[in-house]
């Protein structure tokens, strides 16, 4: 949590939560303990869940995600649109953010159908009160791609942790 004083307002660290971790009865106490141990404000942590992780036991997943949400951490649907996309999941689970997979983002300038899908996903997320993030690895082409995204979509850059600390310190 050394980076928190340097981080811009609203900056969060996102961690993938595996299906096994989501099903683990100790995941909520573990997240609570980890936040306290590292002095990390809950709103600075985002937990990312793939849609497939929700399928094994939706009842347990719903309870666990609700408890994690109550801690104040952000809950994101990771790689939205590439797996078992069910609109019912968006209604049933306490998600804060939809992350549009880089498969779509990388093709947004080349394919009108892909651009239409991204606009549709953004509109759906907006109607449900969810943030939308577009995934792309940090690179020279990132800004060009993000310029083509609909308004309201936040870039979600994949950064190396050492690079992140270096950027924050500057």
Name the predicted role of every residue range:
Residues 19:
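Conserved protein-kinase N-lobe ATP-binding Lys motif
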Residues 29-108, 112, 122-140, 147:
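The catalytic core of metal-dependent phosphodiesterases that act on cyclic dinucleotides
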Residues 134-170:
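N-terminal low-complexity segments that are often proline-rich with Ser/Thr-Pro
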């Amino acid at each position: 949590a050394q980076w928190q004083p340097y981080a811009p307002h609203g900056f969060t660290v996102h961690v993938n939560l595996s299906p096994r971790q989501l099903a683990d009865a100790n995941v909520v106490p573990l997240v609570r303990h980890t936040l306290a141990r590292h002095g990390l404000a809950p709103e600075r942590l985002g937990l990312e869940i793939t849609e497939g992780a929700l399928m094994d036991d939706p009842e347990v997943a719903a309870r666990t995600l609700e408890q994690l949400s109550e801690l104040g951490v952000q809950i994101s649907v990771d790689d939205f649109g590439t797996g078992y996309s069910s609109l019912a999941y968006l209604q049933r689970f306490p998600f804060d953010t939809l992350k549009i997979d880089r498969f779509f983002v990388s093709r947004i300038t080349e394919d009108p159908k892909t651009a239409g899908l991204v606009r549709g996903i953004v509109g759906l997320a907006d109607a449900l009160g969810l943030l939308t993030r577009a995934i792309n690895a940090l690179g020279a082409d990132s800004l060009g791609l993000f310029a083509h995204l609909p308004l309201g979509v936040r870039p979600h850059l994949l950064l190396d942790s050492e690079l992140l600390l270096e950027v924050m310190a500057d």
